[in-house]
């Protein structure tokens, strides 16, 4: 594994921690405390793969957002542990202060076990988290968003040639925003070996890229990490984050109808060549996930299901979490 460790020149000597620097032995003193983390809204609309796709490229499109993941390794981040790690990395990007003028943020852990404690996971999940961490360290995402609105042609009078064929006074203008964003600029750790057997990783330093930091600070929203982690279904995690996000965007007395097809496209897209009833099957799986979330985790959720299976209506509900919600402690609070 030594040949995959980032060269020391990537980090200034002052940025590298000693094995016990700045990290407590216990991350959270109150295991019953609700924890708050952050997740960027594009990853709520178009999330990571649900499972291991065994490819190094993944593309997801939802409405006006297209998200493409690409990795120099054999796989991209995926599944429930990829999602948990993403919200941890995003939270550090949101609340952290850049360590240099370029905008990097360094995150230090004494060992993989301290990262697991921060994530509220048992030591038995170290292999899964190490695996996802490696995928993130070698992955970038391409984010494209298209926003269309109707504008007066006069707004572009200095840019439109007289012979251009725009006849009407009002035009459709689409703003296309895109960027290639690596999650990290590098990662460094020590692996101790005895008799040829690998042990856990120690002295982990993660260097979040300036682009990822800026993106996270601009687009992230708070989520209840305790609930997000407790939901065992990967699709359920995505649905819960989306319900929280959409509800927080509604005003008092407002509601929004989401067609069944849109729900399926967002959370469980149907592959080409699938059975003709697959979309209907996926929709009712999503409905059951929403019902379970309401029953177990979000009883205040005000949502109704169209009896003919055409979609769901979300009405403004009591917010589970607000920005800077005093009921919650940041998942990274003791780092």
Language-model-detected regions and their locations in the chain:
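Charged, alpha-helix-forming regions
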Residues: 2-335
